[in-house]
Amino acid sequence: MLDRILSKSRSRYDTSDRTYGARHDRVGRHAGLSRIADEIRDDIALARVVFSTPTLPGQLAAPDPIGDAPPGITYTVETPHDAGIVITINDVPADWGWISAGGVEAVSPALRALAGELAKLMDGYNHYGAHIGRRFFGRIRVGGETLIW
């Protein structure tokens, strides 16, 4: 949890032509995707418990898309391919996750913020650079729709 809080001030670190995510060292550089997926699951579970606690009246509440999401939402973190991690957001309430604009359903800003926060969390375990490839490719999905690739 401390890594999550500190990542706001300590984002990526660069080494010549390589960029490493803030959580890259937590799993070790030779860790497999299943280990990284386990860490992502733990980060999501911890964020839901810590950041979903209500604040007392008169206190400032820091917005957190994971903690502010409806409690019925569930998450699955899978590694369906050798170089891919997929986070799927399930059981999203229709009135919270989608808006209707001119008869067309679109993803709500709250669901986009949640997907963006999950993508940042997942990207914290990644690395990339000019002479190295990505450690993995990540996707954030809701149902059959990919929100972030």
Predicted regions, residues:
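Intrinsic low-complexity, intrinsically disordered or marginally ordered coil/linker segments
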Residues: M1-W149
